[in-house]
Regions:
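Acyl-donor (CoA/ACP) binding surface of acyl/acetyltransferases
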Residues: 1-42
């Protein structure tokens, strides 16, 4: 599962972290600087 979250959106970043997601890399997305979060489900 992946999520693209704007760097300025700390609430969504905290939610992703609480779900166990980690930052994979920084990416530009639709003109915004974002983080790509992911989690591996087994």
């Amino acid at each position: 599962i992946v999520a693209v979250i704007d760097k300025k959106n700390t609430r969504s970043q905290n939610t992703a972290k609480n779900l166990g997601m980690t930052i994979e890399k920084e990416i530009p997305y639709k003109g915004h600087d974002c983080y790509l979060y992911s989690i591996q489900l087994d």
